[in-house]
Amino acid sequence: MLRDGGDEGMFTIPGFSQIQFEGFCRFIDQGLMEELHQFPKIEDTDQEIEFQLFGESYQLVEPLIKERDAVYESITYSSELYVPAGLIWRTGRNMQEQTVLLGNIPLMNSLGTSIVNGIYRIVINQILQSPGIYYSTGLDHNGISVYTGTIISDWGGRSELEIDRKERIWARVSRKQKISILVLSSAMGSSLREILDNVCYPEIFLSFPNEKEKKKIGSKENAILEFYQKFACVGGDPVFSESLCKELQKKFFQQRCELGRIGRRNMNQRLNLDIPPNNTFLLPRDVLAAADHLIGMKFGMGTLDDMNHLKNKRIRSVADLLQDQFGLALVRLENVVRGTICGAIRHKLIPTPRNLVTSTPLTTTYESFFGLHPLSQVLDRTNPLTQIVHGRKSSYLGPGGLTGRTASFRIRDIHPSHYGRICPIDTSEGINVGLIGSLAIHARVGDWGSIETPFYEISERSKEEQMVYLSPSRDEYYMVAAGNSLALTRGIQEEEVGPARYRQEFLTIAWEQIHLRNIYPFQYFSIGASLIPFIEHNDANRALMSSNMQRQAVPLSQSEKCIVGTGLERQAALDSGGSAIAEREGKIIYTDAEKIVLSGNGDTISIPLVMYQRSNKNTWMHQKPQVHRGKYLKKGQILADGAATVGGELALGKNVSVAYMPWEGYNSEDAVLISERLVYDDIYTSFHIRKYEIQTHVTSQGPERITNEIPHLEPYLLRNLDRNGIVMLGSWVETGDVLVGKLTPQTAKESSYAPEDRLLRAILGIQVSTAKETCLKLPIGGRGRVIDVRWGQKKGGSIYNPEMIRVYISQKRKIKVGDKVAGRHGNKGIISKILPRQDMPYLQDGTPVDMVFNPLGVPSRMNVGQMFECSLGLAGDLLGRHYRITPFDERYEQEASRKLVFSELYEASKQTANPWVFEPEYPGKSRIFDGRTGDPFEQPVIIGKSYMLKLIHQVDDKIHGRSSGHYALVTQQPLRGRAKQGGQRVGEMEVWALEGFGVAHILQEMLTYKSDHIRARQEVLGTTIVGGTIPNPEGAPESFRLLVRELRSLSLELNHFLVSEKNFQINRKEV
């Protein structure tokens, strides 16, 4: 429960993963049944056997394994779907019924995710144009307004109706040639008399057909031929036939005219029709009503549609996507069953339902969906906040949606209908800005695919305010009070007026005319934006960066909750699943680092804790018990904190003392100066767990072997292997060490032996090993402690099944120069220098500050919220208080934030007897001293406690150097990228810079020895070994030779000439 203000109502924030749960439950309860009901009865060619499924009695079996085991064994956490099936013999009139296994359906776990092949995956919501009809206007090539009505089908296909200057109505199917509306209606089965009886403007319909047109609509056959000729773009004179009708029915009327359940509802509402909702196809009546509306638009009646309004969008949730895939799997199963029945009859076998049905179509369909579909993504588990935010994303991208390159600015922009539904702040940066959003805290997906948001209904009859959820199409008809002090206070005088929202406009009206009011200031923000204190004082662009950067924060080894927060930290931590919660009341009878044993209601349960588990971003997930033996607990109490939670609250960073002042230029351009205390006291130390794996295969020469006897490798590299050839638990490993020893057999010819091997065979008769060493070695930057080793084989027990060995290595990373840190207001920076404590600037009580920021980073960025947080954090630290402040507190009175901060600083100054905490001449600022000289700085500066995060962009993952490595085959230049041990590219601008400094020899080295001059590279190697001067490179580098060859392929001959230094005569040389 949250309570906002003294007179506000109480309400509960919905679970942050509720949208995912509701979607999956809707699929299990309704989607499966709907698709199974549509499965057809299958007959053989002689119509003697009939197969059918009885979908209403389907069963889902509880999985045999636990979630944790599915992750470790890299298998799918799924449930088997069983459906009764019947096989009916028409000749004997008897039926054989059996329960058949249709396949496995991946289940959703408590995080709102699915585990597929051991990987947590999540399906995000997609926003699509809702099916129905939309009216718009545009200019033709003559600059004259043209009105069009666009009919969008359920799968996204478009057909257009347009009216020209002569008031003739044309239909354009899939942007191909246009045909008369009368031809389309006749082809759909309406006669001219029926058309004229069902329209409001029959004289307009009669005015434009000439004799030729009247002949085309004289009969249904002529209309179908004309329509087919235009639709299929065929020449000549096609002849009417049943096959032509079937083709048209299949290609156009079934595919492009299916409106679906939502489209039928939208069409009825827009055109004032009363067609039954189960009639989901486009009818002639729809087309004629749409044409009537179009004529009305031409004469200034009716309103145009705003395509970007959320009432014209629909959410394609996890339920819709899973149902679509289930329907696709059943179509594949139908083809398999049909083929199997025909095969059994042909070979005179007696089929049974279990013989006919295979589980492969359903299982493979879902595995390919979760693995390949753009809306199925690997769950981002950097920290607990990231997990819950990922499930609440909404995307315009994906199949049937937009692309980042084609989406217009208008679609990306904030729309008034987003209020309380889609967060106006939290979106991705870059090419997808505005296309990937985040649902607001209170938003939910309704039954018709619309996003709903709650309001309090103000009623004169009842003093109790009722909370109602409204879709985007409904809240336009109400006066909604804006969230200021007037609207949020009861007992207002009737004559007072205040701001309100009505039909996307802002008005000032009397309180008695208000219908609805907001329930909470957070209502229109996402979770990420709602965790920013004093967000109302920040520029929206910086708030956007902060929302994104909080999701990149690394869980620290010693977590700490923020002094200044917004009150949502507890709910975010709870819904993330990072903490262990008591599911019943009872008494703790045993606790240690691995499990907690709880006794209650006469039985005892053991609750296992997460121990050093790796996330897919290589951060650590670990639970620390917070209860002691003998303690009595109630249901819902915290048993253990997660990696980034403290006391059940989200704790992503640390409260550190900061000062805003320049320091010798080390914090210019967003750089950050930090104290060595943060390093030595493990303030910003984090653990990272990396996974390395290797498989053994059976080759044509025999099986690969895991062994610790590896020839031609130094014993030092094998020092950590046990007798099986696998690294020992607890070993400290460095770069290049062997983690798993593996030999691959190969055939060796006599000529491929080394000379010493041939000598041993000839003199002593010793058989030299023909196996090739293919060990798993620790790559660069992977040093650490081995914390887990898993050796397993895929199920089946065959020798051909590969063995899989996984080694988990933990790294302890202290903060260092090059790491990225950020606050909660978009204030980010790279650590530029780590100063000794005695050199840092210190406060008047002798305390050195921990971080020094550049004050120039505040005014131009307009993120002043960090000033309020910084000063209030200092007061809270001195008073031992934690603050949870709702944003937009200026709605109570002007300058409310500043008054709160100054009053708390004044109280802290009085209680601690430190007058420097609040000095009236420059409140919030203080004079501080230079740690190197002891002299005070010239100006007082802002000091305080800020909550700073360490982000996942760490220098250990990015820094890279190359001494030797692989070269590209074509250009002979070093490869690109850190993963391939690539080189640093010297491009045009870098060459110009070197030219500008006149460093000719360095430039020549860059472009020849260090790059693609093959002969010069070899000479450098030889000269380095034997000693001596390195000769100048002669001839052209390989990339120039490549250019010459490409020009020759275009019949352009190119040679180069070398001018001799001695006689300046030109010696012609072939490239």
Curated annotation (Swiss-Prot):
GO terms for biological process: DNA-templated transcription. This is DNA-directed RNA polymerase subunit beta. Its EC number is 2.7.7.6. HAMAP family: RNApol_bact_RpoB (MF_01321). The keyword Membrane does not apply. One of its GO terms (cellular component) is mitochondrion. DNA-dependent RNA polymerase catalyzes the transcription of DNA into RNA using the four ribonucleoside triphosphates as substrates. It is found in: Plastid, Chloroplast. One of its GO terms (molecular function) is ribonucleoside binding. The keyword Chloroplast applies. InterPro entries: DNA-dir_RNA_pol_bsu_ext_1_sf, DNA-dir_RNA_pol_su2, DNA-dir_RNAP_su2_dom, DNA-dir_RNAP_su2_hyb_sf, RNA_pol_bsu_bac, RNA_pol_bsu_CS, RNA_pol_Rpb2_2, RNA_pol_Rpb2_2_sf.
